[in-house]
């Protein structure tokens, strides 16, 4: 038997919080403000954590031309400045070279008017009963417990190690998760079960 779980909201609380900022060319306060405003239209948990960390009312009149690219990030004009906020691949596609954080968490990279402006590191908390759930699966005869996540490899591996998961797949977009599930289904022996939680 194989159980595959999505990380956010299943194994973790889905309540992200800012753990660290590395601002480049701008102040940390300006970095957080621009990120929160650029993400102001999004309901994604990461966007919510940025708005929460900003802690002020969001003036949507300051934000124009918002374009959200699912699984990658957002582009917006904030106070006339072109802001990109998203994962490393999103900024690389824009011709920038984002830094790779060494700390565990999900990095929201920022660019302002085509210049890299650093990253904001966001982390989630493992649910208190997640380890018990994994143990219960094992006791029920599940041979493989795997996790899919859009998070960075370091964040995914930290959760996988803590919960003693057999397989961890990071940097997954929604389409990647579907492909992983199809691959798991294809390699199942006859009579075996695949469950996605």
Model segments located where?
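Cytosolic catalytic headpiece
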Residues: 1-197
